[in-house]
Protein backbone atom coordinates (compact mmCIF):
# COMPACT_ATOMS: atom_id res chain seq x y z
CA UNK A 1 0.00 0.00 0.00
CA UNK A 2 1.19 3.51 -0.87
CA UNK A 3 0.79 6.51 1.38
CA UNK A 4 -1.21 8.42 -1.22
CA UNK A 5 -3.74 5.56 -1.35
CA UNK A 6 -4.47 5.60 2.39
CA UNK A 7 -7.72 7.10 3.69
CA UNK A 8 -6.31 9.54 6.22
CA UNK A 9 -9.60 9.89 8.05
CA UNK A 10 -9.32 6.24 9.09
CA UNK A 11 -5.67 6.33 10.12
CA UNK A 12 -4.73 6.01 13.78
CA UNK A 13 -3.49 9.28 15.39
CA UNK A 14 0.12 8.10 15.36
CA UNK A 15 0.03 7.01 11.72
CA UNK A 16 -1.72 10.23 10.72
CA UNK A 17 1.11 12.15 12.38
CA UNK A 18 3.66 10.08 10.48
CA UNK A 19 1.91 10.78 7.16
CA UNK A 20 1.82 14.52 7.90
CA UNK A 21 5.55 14.48 8.66
CA UNK A 22 6.23 12.59 5.45
CA UNK A 23 4.31 15.24 3.50
CA UNK A 24 6.62 17.85 5.00
CA UNK A 25 9.85 15.89 4.43
CA UNK A 26 8.96 14.29 1.12
CA UNK A 27 12.53 13.73 -0.12
CA UNK A 28 13.73 11.94 3.02
CA UNK A 29 13.40 8.55 4.65
CA UNK A 30 11.79 9.13 8.04
CA UNK A 31 13.16 7.15 10.98
CA UNK A 32 10.15 7.31 13.30
CA UNK A 33 11.04 6.58 16.93
CA UNK A 34 8.80 4.04 18.67
CA UNK A 35 10.28 2.93 21.97
CA UNK A 36 13.65 1.29 21.35
CA UNK A 37 13.24 1.20 17.56
CA UNK A 38 13.16 3.50 14.55
CA UNK A 39 10.29 2.39 12.35
CA UNK A 40 9.57 3.10 8.68
CA UNK A 41 6.16 2.86 7.01
CA UNK A 42 4.56 2.78 3.54
CA UNK A 43 7.03 3.50 0.68
CA UNK A 44 9.89 4.14 3.10
CA UNK A 45 9.47 0.67 4.57
CA UNK A 46 9.45 -0.95 1.12
CA UNK A 47 12.54 1.00 0.07
CA UNK A 48 14.58 0.49 3.25
CA UNK A 49 13.72 -3.19 3.60
CA UNK A 50 15.07 -3.69 0.07
CA UNK A 51 18.18 -1.49 0.40
CA UNK A 52 19.20 -2.80 3.84
CA UNK A 53 17.79 -6.33 3.46
CA UNK A 54 15.48 -5.96 6.45
CA UNK A 55 12.39 -8.02 7.17
CA UNK A 56 9.24 -6.30 5.90
CA UNK A 57 6.27 -6.61 8.22
CA UNK A 58 2.99 -4.74 8.65
CA UNK A 59 1.17 -2.64 11.23
CA UNK A 60 -2.50 -2.10 11.94
CA UNK A 61 -3.21 1.60 11.44
CA UNK A 62 -7.01 1.78 11.18
CA UNK A 63 -7.20 0.72 7.54
CA UNK A 64 -8.60 -2.47 6.03
CA UNK A 65 -5.09 -3.78 5.37
CA UNK A 66 -1.88 -3.53 7.33
CA UNK A 67 0.56 -0.72 6.55
CA UNK A 68 4.03 -1.88 5.33
CA UNK A 69 6.57 -1.52 8.13
CA UNK A 70 10.20 -2.30 8.92
CA UNK A 71 12.46 -1.17 11.74
CA UNK A 72 15.92 -1.05 13.28
CA UNK A 73 17.15 -0.80 16.91
CA UNK A 74 17.81 2.85 17.74
CA UNK A 75 21.16 2.08 19.41
CA UNK A 76 22.46 0.60 16.13
CA UNK A 77 20.96 3.28 13.88
CA UNK A 78 24.29 4.85 12.90
CA UNK A 79 25.30 1.76 10.92
CA UNK A 80 22.04 1.68 8.94
CA UNK A 81 21.96 5.45 8.39
CA UNK A 82 25.51 5.35 7.05
CA UNK A 83 24.54 2.67 4.51
CA UNK A 84 21.56 4.70 3.29
CA UNK A 85 23.60 7.91 3.05
CA UNK A 86 26.23 6.15 0.93
CA UNK A 87 23.43 5.11 -1.42
CA UNK A 88 22.44 8.77 -1.83
CA UNK A 89 19.40 8.96 0.46
CA UNK A 90 18.53 11.53 3.12
CA UNK A 91 17.35 10.40 6.54
CA UNK A 92 15.06 12.45 8.79
CA UNK A 93 15.30 11.48 12.46
CA UNK A 94 11.93 11.78 14.22
CA UNK A 95 12.50 11.55 17.98
CA UNK A 96 10.22 11.27 20.99
CA UNK A 97 10.18 14.70 22.61
CA UNK A 98 8.83 13.51 25.96
CA UNK A 99 9.03 10.51 28.24
CA UNK A 100 6.34 8.02 27.10
CA UNK A 101 5.65 7.21 30.77
CA UNK A 102 4.81 10.86 31.47
CA UNK A 103 2.93 11.57 28.22
CA UNK A 104 -0.76 12.44 28.20
CA UNK A 105 -2.19 10.72 25.15
CA UNK A 106 0.06 10.25 22.12
CA UNK A 107 3.77 10.85 22.70
CA UNK A 108 4.98 14.10 21.12
CA UNK A 109 7.39 13.49 18.26
CA UNK A 110 9.09 15.66 15.67
CA UNK A 111 12.02 15.67 13.26
CA UNK A 112 15.14 16.75 15.14
CA UNK A 113 17.72 16.34 12.40
CA UNK A 114 18.08 15.54 8.71
CA UNK A 115 21.21 13.59 7.81
CA UNK A 116 22.57 13.60 4.27
CA UNK A 117 25.90 12.97 2.57
CA UNK A 118 27.00 16.59 3.10
CA UNK A 119 25.82 16.92 6.69
CA UNK A 120 27.21 13.78 8.32
CA UNK A 121 28.82 14.61 11.66
CA UNK A 122 29.68 11.22 13.14
CA UNK A 123 33.42 10.55 13.05
CA UNK A 124 32.77 6.88 12.25
CA UNK A 125 31.14 7.85 8.94
CA UNK A 126 33.80 10.31 7.77
CA UNK A 127 37.23 9.99 6.15
CA UNK A 128 39.51 11.86 8.55
CA UNK A 129 41.96 12.70 5.75
CA UNK A 130 39.36 14.42 3.54
CA UNK A 131 36.92 17.28 3.88
CA UNK A 132 33.22 16.49 3.64
CA UNK A 133 31.93 19.41 1.61
CA UNK A 134 28.34 20.46 0.97
CA UNK A 135 27.80 23.22 -1.59
CA UNK A 136 25.21 25.44 -3.20
CA UNK A 137 24.99 26.82 -6.74
CA UNK A 138 23.16 30.06 -7.49
CA UNK A 139 22.56 31.21 -11.08
CA UNK A 140 23.17 34.92 -11.79
CA UNK A 141 22.46 34.54 -15.54
CA UNK A 142 25.99 35.47 -16.61
CA UNK A 143 27.84 33.46 -13.94
CA UNK A 144 27.36 30.85 -11.23
CA UNK A 145 28.26 31.37 -7.57
CA UNK A 146 29.50 28.26 -5.79
CA UNK A 147 29.54 28.30 -1.98
CA UNK A 148 30.73 25.27 -0.05
CA UNK A 149 31.53 24.33 3.52
CA UNK A 150 32.58 21.42 5.69
CA UNK A 151 30.28 21.67 8.71
CA UNK A 152 32.52 19.30 10.67
CA UNK A 153 35.43 21.77 10.56
CA UNK A 154 33.71 25.12 9.93
CA UNK A 155 35.68 25.89 6.75
CA UNK A 156 33.68 28.04 4.32
CA UNK A 157 34.54 29.02 0.73
CA UNK A 158 32.92 30.88 -2.14
CA UNK A 159 33.88 31.52 -5.76
CA UNK A 160 32.42 32.75 -9.03
CA UNK A 161 32.36 30.31 -11.96
CA UNK A 162 31.81 30.83 -15.67
CA UNK A 163 28.23 30.32 -16.85
CA UNK A 164 29.16 26.98 -18.37
CA UNK A 165 27.50 23.74 -17.30
CA UNK A 166 30.50 21.49 -17.93
CA UNK A 167 32.84 23.75 -15.96
CA UNK A 168 30.47 23.86 -13.02
CA UNK A 169 30.09 20.08 -12.95
CA UNK A 170 33.86 19.58 -13.28
CA UNK A 171 34.44 21.99 -10.40
CA UNK A 172 32.04 20.07 -8.17
CA UNK A 173 33.80 16.80 -8.99
CA UNK A 174 37.25 18.39 -8.59
CA UNK A 175 36.42 19.59 -5.07
CA UNK A 176 34.83 16.28 -4.12
CA UNK A 177 31.64 17.98 -2.92
CA UNK A 178 29.28 15.32 -1.56
CA UNK A 179 25.97 17.22 -1.72
CA UNK A 180 24.75 20.17 -3.78
CA UNK A 181 21.80 22.53 -3.37
CA UNK A 182 20.78 24.37 -6.55
CA UNK A 183 18.39 27.27 -7.03
CA UNK A 184 15.60 26.81 -9.57
CA UNK A 185 17.32 29.02 -12.17
CA UNK A 186 20.25 26.63 -12.54
CA UNK A 187 20.15 24.62 -15.76
CA UNK A 188 18.49 21.27 -15.02
CA UNK A 189 21.26 19.52 -16.95
CA UNK A 190 23.57 20.25 -14.01
CA UNK A 191 21.05 18.84 -11.54
CA UNK A 192 20.47 15.62 -13.49
CA UNK A 193 24.14 14.96 -14.31
CA UNK A 194 25.26 15.45 -10.72
CA UNK A 195 22.48 13.20 -9.45
CA UNK A 196 22.37 10.50 -12.14
CA UNK A 197 25.92 10.38 -13.53
CA UNK A 198 27.95 11.14 -10.41
CA UNK A 199 25.53 9.95 -7.68
CA UNK A 200 25.83 13.25 -5.81
CA UNK A 201 22.95 14.12 -3.48
CA UNK A 202 21.13 17.09 -5.01
CA UNK A 203 18.22 19.35 -4.02
CA UNK A 204 16.38 22.18 -5.77
CA UNK A 205 15.73 24.96 -3.24
CA UNK A 206 15.35 28.73 -3.65
CA UNK A 207 15.01 29.84 -0.02
CA UNK A 208 17.74 31.99 1.52
CA UNK A 209 18.50 32.78 5.15
CA UNK A 210 16.79 36.04 6.12
CA UNK A 211 18.46 36.79 9.46
CA UNK A 212 21.61 38.80 10.09
CA UNK A 213 23.00 36.78 13.00
CA UNK A 214 25.76 35.31 10.79
CA UNK A 215 27.04 38.65 9.51
CA UNK A 216 30.43 38.08 11.17
CA UNK A 217 31.04 35.33 8.58
CA UNK A 218 30.64 37.79 5.69
CA UNK A 219 31.78 41.01 7.43
CA UNK A 220 34.51 41.69 4.85
CA UNK A 221 32.42 40.75 1.81
CA UNK A 222 30.93 43.54 -0.32
CA UNK A 223 29.89 41.62 -3.44
CA UNK A 224 26.19 40.78 -2.98
CA UNK A 225 26.56 37.65 -5.12
CA UNK A 226 28.81 36.02 -2.52
CA UNK A 227 26.43 37.07 0.26
CA UNK A 228 23.42 35.62 -1.58
CA UNK A 229 25.29 32.37 -2.26
CA UNK A 230 26.26 32.04 1.40
CA UNK A 231 22.72 32.66 2.65
CA UNK A 232 21.35 30.15 0.15
CA UNK A 233 23.58 27.44 1.61
CA UNK A 234 23.12 28.62 5.20
CA UNK A 235 19.33 28.37 5.02
CA UNK A 236 19.54 24.72 3.97
CA UNK A 237 21.94 23.92 6.81
CA UNK A 238 19.97 25.67 9.56
CA UNK A 239 16.62 24.23 8.42
CA UNK A 240 17.87 20.67 8.03
CA UNK A 241 20.27 20.47 10.95
CA UNK A 242 17.81 22.07 13.39
CA UNK A 243 20.75 23.77 15.10
CA UNK A 244 22.88 26.89 14.86
CA UNK A 245 25.97 27.06 12.66
CA UNK A 246 27.87 29.43 14.94
CA UNK A 247 31.14 27.60 14.39
CA UNK A 248 31.38 28.54 10.69
CA UNK A 249 34.59 30.44 10.01
CA UNK A 250 34.83 33.72 8.12
CA UNK A 251 34.18 33.04 4.45
CA UNK A 252 37.20 32.68 2.14
CA UNK A 253 36.71 34.09 -1.35
CA UNK A 254 38.63 31.99 -3.86
CA UNK A 255 39.72 33.85 -7.00
CA UNK A 256 41.18 32.40 -10.16
CA UNK A 257 44.40 34.42 -9.96
CA UNK A 258 45.24 33.09 -6.46
CA UNK A 259 45.86 29.50 -7.54
CA UNK A 260 47.08 27.56 -10.54
CA UNK A 261 44.15 26.77 -12.83
CA UNK A 262 43.56 23.05 -13.02
CA UNK A 263 40.57 21.01 -14.17
CA UNK A 264 39.45 17.57 -13.07
CA UNK A 265 41.12 15.88 -16.07
CA UNK A 266 44.53 17.37 -15.19
CA UNK A 267 44.10 16.33 -11.59
CA UNK A 268 43.30 12.76 -12.64
CA UNK A 269 46.02 12.44 -15.28
CA UNK A 270 48.68 13.72 -12.88
CA UNK A 271 47.34 11.36 -10.20
CA UNK A 272 47.58 14.14 -7.64
CA UNK A 273 45.23 12.70 -5.01
CA UNK A 274 44.19 9.32 -6.41
CA UNK A 275 45.59 6.84 -8.91
CA UNK A 276 44.02 6.46 -12.34
CA UNK A 277 44.00 2.69 -12.07
CA UNK A 278 41.71 2.21 -9.07
CA UNK A 279 40.87 5.78 -7.99
CA UNK A 280 42.38 5.12 -4.58
CA UNK A 281 44.73 7.34 -2.57
CA UNK A 282 47.51 4.77 -2.76
CA UNK A 283 50.22 5.46 -5.40
CA UNK A 284 49.09 9.07 -5.88
CA UNK A 285 51.30 12.12 -5.25
CA UNK A 286 49.35 12.81 -2.06
CA UNK A 287 49.97 9.26 -0.84
CA UNK A 288 53.70 9.68 -1.48
CA UNK A 289 54.02 13.04 0.28
CA UNK A 290 51.61 12.56 3.15
CA UNK A 291 53.74 11.91 6.21
CA UNK A 292 51.67 14.27 8.33
CA UNK A 293 51.02 13.46 11.98
CA UNK A 294 47.45 14.76 12.27
CA UNK A 295 44.23 14.46 10.30
CA UNK A 296 44.18 18.26 10.06
CA UNK A 297 47.61 18.26 8.46
CA UNK A 298 46.58 15.58 5.97
CA UNK A 299 43.56 17.60 4.86
CA UNK A 300 45.69 20.75 4.58
CA UNK A 301 48.30 18.98 2.45
CA UNK A 302 45.57 17.70 0.12
CA UNK A 303 44.29 21.26 -0.27
CA UNK A 304 47.78 22.57 -1.05
CA UNK A 305 48.27 19.94 -3.75
CA UNK A 306 44.89 20.64 -5.34
CA UNK A 307 45.36 24.41 -5.24
CA UNK A 308 49.02 25.27 -5.97
CA UNK A 309 49.93 28.88 -5.17
CA UNK A 310 50.87 31.28 -7.98
CA UNK A 311 51.55 34.39 -5.88
CA UNK A 312 55.32 34.70 -5.47
CA UNK A 313 55.19 36.31 -2.01
CA UNK A 314 52.93 33.57 -0.64
CA UNK A 315 55.16 30.88 -2.14
CA UNK A 316 58.29 32.47 -0.63
CA UNK A 317 56.59 32.72 2.76
CA UNK A 318 55.79 29.01 2.67
CA UNK A 319 59.36 28.23 1.62
CA UNK A 320 60.72 30.27 4.54
CA UNK A 321 58.81 28.14 7.05
CA UNK A 322 59.97 24.93 5.38
CA UNK A 323 63.55 26.21 5.42
CA UNK A 324 63.43 26.96 9.16
CA UNK A 325 62.09 23.49 9.96
CA UNK A 326 64.77 21.90 7.76
CA UNK A 327 67.50 23.83 9.56
CA UNK A 328 66.07 23.00 13.00
CA UNK A 329 65.88 19.27 12.37
CA UNK A 330 65.84 18.21 16.03
CA UNK A 331 63.12 20.72 16.90
CA UNK A 332 61.15 19.62 13.84
CA UNK A 333 61.23 15.98 14.95
CA UNK A 334 60.21 17.00 18.46
CA UNK A 335 57.34 19.05 17.02
CA UNK A 336 56.17 16.07 14.95
CA UNK A 337 56.25 13.90 18.08
CA UNK A 338 53.94 16.31 19.90
CA UNK A 339 51.64 16.75 16.91
CA UNK A 340 51.17 12.98 16.83
CA UNK A 341 49.49 13.31 20.24
CA UNK A 342 46.98 15.89 18.97
CA UNK A 343 43.57 14.60 17.89
CA UNK A 344 41.46 16.17 15.13
CA UNK A 345 40.81 19.49 16.89
CA UNK A 346 38.89 20.95 13.94
CA UNK A 347 36.28 18.21 13.97
CA UNK A 348 36.26 17.93 17.75
CA UNK A 349 35.40 21.63 17.99
CA UNK A 350 32.83 21.16 15.22
CA UNK A 351 31.02 18.39 17.12
CA UNK A 352 31.12 20.42 20.33
CA UNK A 353 29.68 23.48 18.54
CA UNK A 354 26.97 21.33 16.95
CA UNK A 355 26.23 19.76 20.36
CA UNK A 356 26.89 16.20 19.20
CA UNK A 357 30.10 15.61 21.17
CA UNK A 358 30.35 12.64 23.51
CA UNK A 359 32.61 11.82 26.45
CA UNK A 360 35.31 10.41 24.17
CA UNK A 361 35.42 13.71 22.26
CA UNK A 362 35.89 15.69 25.48
CA UNK A 363 38.72 13.41 26.60
CA UNK A 364 40.42 13.75 23.21
CA UNK A 365 40.09 17.52 23.46
CA UNK A 366 41.66 17.48 26.93
CA UNK A 367 44.58 15.31 25.80
CA UNK A 368 45.16 17.54 22.77
CA UNK A 369 45.13 20.75 24.81
CA UNK A 370 47.63 19.21 27.22
CA UNK A 371 50.21 19.07 24.42
CA UNK A 372 49.72 22.61 23.07
CA UNK A 373 52.06 24.37 25.57
CA UNK A 374 54.91 22.09 24.44
CA UNK A 375 54.14 22.92 20.81
CA UNK A 376 54.07 26.63 21.68
CA UNK A 377 57.52 26.38 23.28
CA UNK A 378 58.93 25.08 20.00
CA UNK A 379 57.13 27.72 17.93
CA UNK A 380 58.45 30.42 20.25
CA UNK A 381 62.01 29.14 19.93
CA UNK A 382 61.91 29.57 16.14
CA UNK A 383 60.16 32.97 16.37
CA UNK A 384 56.96 31.66 14.82
CA UNK A 385 53.42 32.73 15.68
CA UNK A 386 52.24 30.95 18.81
CA UNK A 387 48.92 29.18 19.29
CA UNK A 388 46.28 30.79 21.56
CA UNK A 389 46.51 30.20 25.31
CA UNK A 390 43.89 27.57 26.21
CA UNK A 391 45.17 26.68 29.67
CA UNK A 392 41.92 27.73 31.36
CA UNK A 393 39.88 25.43 29.10
CA UNK A 394 42.30 22.58 29.71
CA UNK A 395 42.06 23.07 33.48
CA UNK A 396 38.26 23.11 33.27
CA UNK A 397 38.30 19.72 31.55
CA UNK A 398 40.78 18.32 34.09
CA UNK A 399 38.63 19.48 37.00
CA UNK A 400 35.30 18.35 35.58
CA UNK A 401 35.68 15.17 33.48
CA UNK A 402 36.35 11.66 34.78
CA UNK A 403 39.39 9.91 33.29
CA UNK A 404 37.40 6.95 31.90
CA UNK A 405 33.75 7.93 31.45
CA UNK A 406 31.25 5.93 29.35
CA UNK A 407 31.08 7.08 25.72
CA UNK A 408 27.36 7.92 25.79
CA UNK A 409 26.35 11.11 27.59
CA UNK A 410 23.10 9.56 28.83
CA UNK A 411 24.93 6.88 30.80
CA UNK A 412 26.19 9.39 33.37
CA UNK A 413 29.52 9.25 35.23
CA UNK A 414 30.97 12.02 33.05
CA UNK A 415 31.20 14.99 35.45
CA UNK A 416 33.27 14.46 38.59
CA UNK A 417 31.64 14.47 42.01
CA UNK A 418 32.24 17.75 43.80
CA UNK A 419 32.56 19.83 40.63
CA UNK A 420 29.01 21.20 40.76
CA UNK A 421 26.94 21.23 43.95
CA UNK A 422 23.57 21.31 42.18
CA UNK A 423 24.55 18.39 39.92
CA UNK A 424 25.70 16.40 42.96
CA UNK A 425 22.29 16.93 44.57
CA UNK A 426 20.53 15.74 41.42
CA UNK A 427 22.77 12.65 41.31
CA UNK A 428 21.88 11.88 44.91
CA UNK A 429 18.20 12.24 44.10
CA UNK A 430 18.50 9.89 41.16
CA UNK A 431 20.45 7.21 43.01
CA UNK A 432 18.69 7.55 46.35
CA UNK A 433 15.46 9.36 45.51
CA UNK A 434 13.26 7.15 47.67
CA UNK A 435 15.48 7.75 50.70
CA UNK A 436 15.31 11.50 50.09
CA UNK A 437 11.49 11.45 49.94
CA UNK A 438 11.25 9.29 53.08
CA UNK A 439 13.60 11.60 54.98
CA UNK A 440 11.74 14.65 53.72
CA UNK A 441 8.43 13.15 54.87
CA UNK A 442 9.83 12.55 58.37
CA UNK A 443 11.27 16.07 58.54
CA UNK A 444 7.94 17.64 57.55
CA UNK A 445 6.01 15.58 60.09
CA UNK A 446 8.35 16.74 62.84
CA UNK A 447 8.36 20.35 61.67
CA UNK A 448 4.57 20.67 61.31
CA UNK A 449 3.46 18.29 64.02
CA UNK A 450 1.13 16.55 61.53
CA UNK A 451 1.57 12.84 62.22
CA UNK A 452 -0.42 11.61 59.19
CA UNK A 453 1.46 13.78 56.65
CA UNK A 454 2.50 11.83 53.52
CA UNK A 455 4.50 12.68 50.40
CA UNK A 456 3.01 11.19 47.23
CA UNK A 457 3.51 11.32 43.45
CA UNK A 458 1.37 11.04 40.32
CA UNK A 459 1.79 11.86 36.63
CA UNK A 460 -0.59 14.83 36.74
CA UNK A 461 0.72 16.85 39.70
CA UNK A 462 4.17 15.36 40.27
CA UNK A 463 5.19 15.24 43.95
CA UNK A 464 2.67 16.47 46.51
CA UNK A 465 2.01 16.51 50.27
CA UNK A 466 -1.13 14.83 51.55
CA UNK A 467 -2.77 15.49 54.95
CA UNK A 468 -6.19 14.80 56.44
CA UNK A 469 -8.86 17.51 56.67
CA UNK A 470 -8.57 17.43 60.43
CA UNK A 471 -4.94 18.55 60.18
CA UNK A 472 -5.60 21.63 58.00
CA UNK A 473 -5.56 23.84 61.10
CA UNK A 474 -1.84 23.09 61.54
CA UNK A 475 -0.94 24.32 58.01
CA UNK A 476 0.14 27.98 57.99
CA UNK A 477 0.94 30.19 54.98
CA UNK A 478 4.59 30.01 55.96
CA UNK A 479 4.33 26.24 56.03
CA UNK A 480 2.73 26.16 52.58
CA UNK A 481 5.49 28.33 51.11
CA UNK A 482 8.17 26.21 52.75
CA UNK A 483 6.69 23.01 51.34
CA UNK A 484 6.44 24.47 47.83
CA UNK A 485 10.11 25.41 47.91
CA UNK A 486 11.27 22.04 49.16
CA UNK A 487 9.14 19.66 47.08
Describe each model-derived feature in a short phrase.
Residues 481-487:
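Conserved small/polar residues in nucleotide/adenosyl-binding loops
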Residues 33-34, 456, 468:
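A secondary-structure boundary/capping signal
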Residues 134-136, 452-456, 464:
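Short, surface-exposed charged micro-motifs
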Residues 375, 396, 400, 463-478:
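Cytosolic, long alpha-helical scaffolding segments
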Residues 328-329:
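Short intracellular "coupling" helices and adjacent cytoplasmic loop segments at the cytosolic face
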Residues 2-324, 333, 337-353, 357-442:
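Charged catalytic and DNA/RNA-contacting regions of genome-maintenance
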Amino acid sequence: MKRCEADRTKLSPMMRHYVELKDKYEDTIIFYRLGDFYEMFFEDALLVSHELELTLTGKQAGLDERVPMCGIPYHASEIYIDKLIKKGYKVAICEQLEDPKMAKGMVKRDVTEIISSGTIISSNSLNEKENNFIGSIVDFKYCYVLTYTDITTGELYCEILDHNNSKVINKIIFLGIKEVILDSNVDKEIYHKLRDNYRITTSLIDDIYEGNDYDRVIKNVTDTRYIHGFKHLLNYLVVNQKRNMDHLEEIVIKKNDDYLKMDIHTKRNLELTESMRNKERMYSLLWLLDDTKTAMGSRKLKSWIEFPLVDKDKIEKRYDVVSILNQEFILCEELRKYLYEVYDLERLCGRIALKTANARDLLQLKKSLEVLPKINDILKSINYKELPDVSSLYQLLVDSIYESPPVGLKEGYLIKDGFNKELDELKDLRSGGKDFISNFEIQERERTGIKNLKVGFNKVFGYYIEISKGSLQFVTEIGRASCRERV
